[in-house]
């Protein structure tokens, strides 16, 4: 790695350790020319797959869209912002863990349903009514029954 002080091409790693969250490596480096020390952080670049929509179009994953959908379903429900952020984090991790370049929007919707089911049943039904495109009250009732069991 290039020294930020004197631009020497090669520096020496003096110390390496994991950060507290365990997702990064903190490296303490020293330049052999100017003797300055500096810290770098290294983390894996995990790619989030593109989303293939029902009509076949593709778009990059948008965390804001996910947050908006969850917030809309959870509106006026007793669920903390921290719980919502953790749910988003779990969904993103599951998307990264697929290792795929593309996933169907249905896969993302199913992940959201799973998170909402454990967070708040009313929010789950709100999201499901739009996501599963209930055509009539009967389908709505069946989903509520499934949720009870």
Swiss-Prot record:
PROSITE patterns (alphabetical): ATP_CONE
Co-factor binding comment: Binds 1 zinc ion.
Pfam families referenced in this protein's UniProt entry, alphabetically: ATP-cone, Zn_ribbon_NrdR
Stretches annotated zinc finger (unnamed): 3-34
Superkingdom assignment: Bacteria
Classification via InterPro entries: ATP-cone_dom (IPR005144), NrdR-like_N (IPR055173), RNR_NrdR-like (IPR003796)
GO biological process: negative regulation of DNA-templated transcription
Domain ATP-cone: start-end pairs: 49-139
Example of a GO MF term: ATP binding
UniProt keywords, alphabetically: ATP-binding, DNA-binding, Metal-binding, Nucleotide-binding, Repressor, Transcription, Transcription regulation, Zinc, Zinc-finger
Cofactor: Zn(2+)
Role of this protein: Negatively regulates transcription of bacterial ribonucleotide reductase nrd genes and operons by binding to NrdR-boxes.
PANTHER family found in the cross-reference section: TRANSCRIPTIONAL REPRESSOR NRDR
Family as reported in the entry's similarity comment: Belongs to the NrdR family.
Protein name: Transcriptional repressor NrdR
């Amino acid at each position: 790695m290039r020294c930020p002080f004197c631009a020497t091409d090669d520096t020496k790693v003096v110390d390496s350790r994991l950060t507290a969250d365990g997702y990064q490596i903190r490296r303490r480096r020293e330049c052999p020319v100017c003797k300055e020390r500096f810290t770098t952080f290294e983390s894996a670049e995990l790619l989030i797959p593109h989303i293939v929509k029902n009509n076949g179009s593709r778009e990059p994953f948008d965390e804001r869209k996910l947050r908006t959908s969850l917030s809309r379903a959870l509106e006026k429900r007793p669920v903390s912002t921290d719980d919502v952020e953790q749910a988003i984090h779990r969904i993103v991790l599951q998307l990264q863990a697929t290792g795929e370049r593309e996933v169907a929007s249905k896969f993302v919707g199913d992940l959201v349903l799973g998170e909402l089911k454990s967070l708040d049943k009313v929010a789950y039904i709100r999201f499901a009514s739009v996501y599963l495109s209930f055509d009539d009250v009967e389908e709505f009732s069946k989903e509520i029954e499934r949720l009870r069991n």
